[in-house]
Regions:
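Recognizes extended acidic, P/S/T-rich segments that occur
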Residues: 16-53
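Extracellular fibronectin type III
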Residues: 65-82
Length: 343
């Protein structure tokens, strides 16, 4: 029998004397010992091997006095886990840029295989209309992947790819990366799995940008993070030339307020709503080839699930972890591919 698994599910087996008394044996997920998030809430992760999860085949048997009972054993299967839209990075499309050097110029994103409005895209990339190297497709093995590489057009822009959309504001020469997509979770994942290949370098004197405390000798790390959210709207992060002017006129604090950065590992929930779970992975050294990566999800709430129609999934990849601060090395490269949930 195929069973539906809505979360890290709890099941129970009931038995009783006919007409009298009830006994219940439970099969439930178990959680790692909790730790405290910097915002003050406890966070925890799912233990592998406990509970009932999506995409699994389970064996069961009844045991009495430490001995199996003949004829009371079998298997059951739960429904397959969900796919992440276009997570295999094999299908790419183009949509018109907000600022295009040539009439009709377009830039790429992973998605449907025909031109469409950005509003219909699941993945987006910031500032790609200025320089198309920030996110392009690359041929790797039997399919395609996303290739992220930073560039400077007056200020530094990191190679990036995220679930959401990007809006360009011409009057400010700035843009807003708006993070989050509506995604109907049917099962609670334990982790996000993907593959990556990376080149990382020291930040360098020219790449310091506006990051407080950054040093030229610091490694310009790549970063991938994921969030399960329950947001009323997307969270918007500003980047672009206006920030340089704000810093000169009002100081770094004003720049950061305008930028509105968000880091799920260190920050409290933003104004848009709750972060139910998050996971983060920093790429601190270059790789010699493809690396398999599993990013464990830390749950701030073990019972909640996103409400229908809310912005519920954030995945963000950047060739420079502090690209929001216009900080990074243009030599950094990041290839990403095969995004999928682990249950």
């Amino acid at each position: 029998e195929m069973l539906r698994s809505l979360v890290g599910s709890e099941m129970c087996i009931r038995d009783r004397d006919k007409g009298d008394g009830t006994s219940i044996a439970r099969i439930a997920p178990e959680w790692e010992e909790s730790e405290v998030h910097p915002s003050g809430v406890s966070v925890t992760s799912l233990l592998r091997g406990y509970g009932v999860f999506a995409g699994k085949t389970y064996e069961y048997r009844l045991v009495a006095d430490s001995q199996p009972v003949d004829g009371l054993a079998g298997t059951f299967q739960t429904e397959a886990g969900q796919a992440i839209p276009y997570g295999d990075m094999n299908t790419w499309a183009e949509y018109n840029g907000y600022y295009t050097p040539e009439p009709g110029d377009t830039y790429a994103y992973p998605g449907v295989s025909y031109p469409c409005p950005q509003e219909e895209a699941f993945w987006g990339n910031g500032n790609n209309m200025f320089t198309k190297t920030l996110c392009t497709s690359a041929e790797e093995g039997e399919g395609k992947c996303a290739y992220l590489k930073g560039m400077s057009f007056g200020v530094y822009a990191a190679g990036n790819l995220f679930t959401g959309k990007f809006d360009f504001v011409g009057a400010e020469l700035s843009g807003y990366a708006r993070f989050g997509q509506v995604y109907a979770f049917e099962a609670r994942p334990r982790a996000l799995r993907l593959r990556y290949k990376a080149t990382v370098n020291p930040i360098g004197e020219e790449g310091l940008g506006l990051k407080p405390g950054a040093s030229a000798t610091d490694i310009d790390e790549g970063r991938i993070f994921v969030c399960i959210t329950d947001w009323s709207e997307r969270h918007s992060v500003c980047s672009g030339l206006i920030l340089s002017g704000i810093q000169q006129e009002q100081g770094t604090d004003a720049m950061i307020e305008k930028m509105n950065p968000f880091d799920p590992v260190t920050d409290a929930d933003p104004a848009e709503g709750k972060v139910i779970a998050y996971g983060s992975y920093n790429i601190t050294q270059s790789t010699t080839g493809w690396v398999d990566c599993e990013i464990k999800l830390m749950y701030k709430d073990t019972e909640a699930r996103p409400a229908d129609g809310r912005y519920s999934l954030v995945i963000s990849c950047a060739s420079s972890a502090f690209g929001d601060y216009l900080c990074g090395n243009m030599g950094n490269e990041l290839y990403v591919d095969d995004f999928q949930w682990v249950y």
